[in-house]
């Protein structure tokens, strides 16, 4: 019975970590998210090893199934938030690339680099 309680606690820890990761992503605390991800991966790996040994009862299996569904829902939400961030970064990289093209093309005609959208002084 103690092993089954430990297994449930392990799943609850994973769920808690995934919820914290979502909160960090929503507040754009990306560095903290990356740090927490290491703890999350470690918890998942140790729980996976422990799950094979425990042999949970039917009642516990149902609890674990519900907890696992919550974890998977969190994974989906986190993936969506990370995709949003990746799209933002792609846009910033695209702007930077366009800025570099403008500067290299037109910068040779002026003593200073041009910024996109900046009025030109003649």
Swiss-Prot record:
Name of the featured protein: Flagellar protein FliT
NCBIfam families named among the record's database cross-references: PRK10548.1
Keyword NADP in annotation: no
Function field: Dual-function protein that regulates the transcription of class 2 flagellar operons and that also acts as an export chaperone for the filament-capping protein FliD. As a transcriptional regulator, acts as an anti-FlhDC factor; it directly binds FlhC, thus inhibiting the binding of the FlhC/FlhD complex to class 2 promoters, resulting in decreased expression of class 2 flagellar operons. As a chaperone, effects FliD transition to the membrane by preventing its premature polymerization, and by directing it to the export apparatus.
Keywords, sorted A to Z: Bacterial flagellum biogenesis, Chaperone, Cytoplasm, Repressor, Transcription, Transcription regulation
Complexes and interactors: Homodimer. Interacts with FliD and FlhC.
One GO cellular component term noted in the UniProt record for this chain: cytosol
Domain of life where this protein originates: Bacteria
Main location: cytoplasm
Subcellular location: Cytoplasm, Cytosol
Biological process (GO), any one: bacterial-type flagellum organization
Organism: Serratia proteamaculans (strain 568)
Region FliD binding: start-end pairs: 60-98
Protein family (similarity comment): Belongs to the FliT family.
InterPro entries the record matches: FliT
Keyword Transcription regulation among record annotations: yes
